[in-house]
Each structure stands twice: as C-alpha cells, then as structure tokens.
Amino acid sequence: LAACFVLPVEDDLDSIFKSLHYAAKISKSGSGTGFNFSRLRPKNDVISSVTGFSSGPMSFMKIFDAVTEQIKLGGLRRGAHMGILRVDHPDIGEFVTIKAKEKVLENFNISVAITDKFMNAVQKDKSYNLINPRTQKNVRDESAEKIFDLICETAHKTGDPGVIFLDKINKDNPTPALGILESTDSCGEQPLLPYESANLGSINLSNIIINNKIDFNKLKNTVHKTIHFLDNVIDMCKYPTPETKEIVHANRKIGLGVMGFADLLIKLKIPYNSERAVKTAEKLIAFIRKEADNASVNLTKERLTFPNWDESIYNKK
C-alpha cells in the first residue's frame, strides 16, 4: 500500500548491494525508492583495500537503473527511483548533466541536495568547496554561480535535476534525534529517514465546492477521515524489509496532499494566475494543516502517541 521507500547507501559494497537487493524487491511490488548517493567516494578516488580506484556514484546509479529495467511488472510497469547527490560532492558536474544523454538513468528522477551555504555563495558570486565524502577534505573550489547555472540550464532542457533544500527540510524534521533528512521518495513529495515509507493520500478539492462556495465543513470532515485512513494504512501495509516495518511503525509518518486545485478555481471563476488564486491556496492549505493536526491529536485519544514520540520535537512543545 505504501507508494515509496527510502534506502540508505553507504560507501561500501555490502551496503550498496544490500540496498540494491531491497530496491529490486520494492520495484517488483510496484513501489518506488529514494536514494542519496552522496556518501559514495568520487570517481578516481583511491580504494586502498584493492589498490584500485573508485568508479564514482554515477556508475552505481547505472547498476540500480539496469536492475530496475529488468524487473517488469506484468510487462507494463517498472519501479521508479529518486537519486540525490549533494551539491558539494566532487562529481556534481557529471551528476547534473547525466540525464542530458538519451537512454541514461531512465528509471531515475535526479535531484541536487542544496545547502544554505551554497546558495549564499551563489548570491555573492563566490566559490565553494567540493568535499570528498571519504576524507571530508576539500578536493577543489568551484564557482557556485557556474554550478547553479548548470543546474538551471539542464533542468530547463531535460526536466532534471530537481533540487532539495537540505537545511529547510531538516528545519522541519520531526525526529532530528533519529537522524538527518537527506532523501525523499521517488517523486520528491516527502523527505524521509532511511527505511521510512511514503504513505500518501490526496484530497480532491474539486469535490468541496457546494453552491459555488468552498464547503469548509465538508473539507474538515474529509481531512479527519483521511488522516484516520492513512494511519490505518500503516498497520495494514506489507513491508519489504524488517527495517522498514520497524521504523514506519515507530514514527507513523503520513503525507496528506491535494489534487483538483485548478478545477476548484474554475468552479469559483478565479483565474489561475491571479493573486486571488494564491490567497485561496494559502487559506486552503492552512485550514487543511490545522485540521490534520487536530485529527492527529484526536487519534492519540484512541491509539496513544506514536512510539518514537519521546524522540520527536513534539515532546518538547
């Protein structure tokens, strides 16, 4: 029932191929996976154990892609991945442009993990450090504006890469004591810790228009039912790995979104590109967030708090 999962990728073959094995199982079930490859040493970096040199993160991404390509679901559907690399990884230039070539990483969305430090360097037209993840030492300096322009130009031409703002998502991390957020599900809706799943649902906003007005009572009722439903999904879902089952049940994350906003605007005769449309979106999302929180609180009266409550930011409020 879960749409996607996040798997960790550490800088050793056991970790890489363990995640590949899990990814194959997940793809077979029709779900997607998210990976952050930033811990892998850069291309041509030394491998002391075999007196050789690393092939770099992109070579392993191609292996993940090839395995996924072979797992056909009824001959029609394959799994999908999100591949992420930090903007300060030495191989960032190759990563940004890799999908500009045809038939490369066709089963991957890719995104650059961007930091506030990098964006400050872009704004000030300064260089920034590219860091070897194995040694944590500076490999070379690079123009932040050059890399940022490359990201924008390539995204405009090919649709990839996207960007993920690491500092922002970790500012909103509900369980920072359990680890930092550095990956998302395959379409980027939800930042997740290793082995967490994206348990997602959407409310069709087109259905809350009654007599040419937004029916907030209907929306409230829908939000509360959806929160209850998504929490039930956590217990009903079959999980591909023991690690996933453990952390999903411990954190009980869900993702509530919306669809049909353009249809809602049409019914209300509001132009999509208007200030009124922006205000309507802000009002709706604020209402949904408030009622989702209220619904979650109501669930605790029946089901108590989630097991990792003591490790969360909510325990301090």
What is the predicted role of each segment?
Residues 37-43, 84-92, 115, 135-138, ...:
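A glycine-rich phosphate-binding loop feature that marks nucleotide/adenosyl-phosphate handling sites
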Residues 51-66, 93:
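Glycine- and Gly-Pro-enriched alpha-helical subdomains that act as flexible
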Residues 1-12, 133-154, 158-163, 283-317:
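Gly/Pro-rich turn-and-neighbor structural signature
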Residues 13, 47, 71-83, 102-105, ...:
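Inter-helical turn/loop segments and adjacent helix faces that build the functional surface
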Residues 97-158:
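Polar, glycine-rich mid-to-C-terminal structural blocks
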Residues 1, 20, 222-245, 249, ...:
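Internal maturation/activation junctions in enzymes
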